[in-house]
Amino acid sequence: MKQLLDFLPLVVFFIFYKLYDIFVASGALIVASAIALAVSWLLYRKVEKMALFTFALVAIFGTLTIALHNPDFIKWKVTIIYGLFTLALLFSHWFMQQPLIQKMLGKEIRLPTTAWRRLNIAWALFFLACGLANIYVAFWLSQDTWMNFKVFGLSGLTLLFTLLSGIYIYRLMPQDEK
């Protein structure tokens, strides 16, 4: 249910873009994101910090897109989010005791420290690549192409990378935890 709530605003954004335009879609994205936060609060009595942070960026960049009638703002939001994820992962890798990935998953999964560090760097590089790819597609290809890339390309790549990460984790897990 949680993953559906996270994915729903993106679906709403895509549908409203196809039915109307990027400006109406940006407004719908803001509303759908707010509703997803409210439903998350009602169901789980908590809202994750990452969800609040993402909503803040959606609200800021979506509002700028609508107010200034410039779709570049909503396009930049994607790269900024990926860039901040990259920086957070790299910061944790170099300056914290535990990599961020280990902090997020380490309570449920036991892995050697080197595995956590590799996984952390892999995700940082993945987010960096996605952010750079978004810049290219958003500003050198058509808006329709960017929308399809954002919804299907980036979502598909993230799902694939999550699956590959799961395989990597499974291979390194202690036998008694598999």
From Swiss-Prot:
Its main location: membrane. PANTHER family: INNER MEMBRANE-SPANNING PROTEIN YCIB, INTRACELLULAR SEPTATION PROTEIN A-RELATED. GO terms for cellular component: plasma membrane. Plays a role in cell envelope biogenesis, maintenance of cell envelope integrity and membrane homeostasis. It comes from Erwinia tasmaniensis (strain DSM 17950 / CFBP 7177 / CIP 109463 / NCPPB 4357 / Et1/99). HAMAP family: YciB. NCBIfam families: ispZ, PRK00259.1-2, PRK00259.1-3, PRK00259.1-4. Keywords: Cell inner membrane, Cell membrane, Membrane, Transmembrane, Transmembrane helix. It comes from the Bacteria. InterPro entries: YciB. This is Inner membrane-spanning protein YciB.
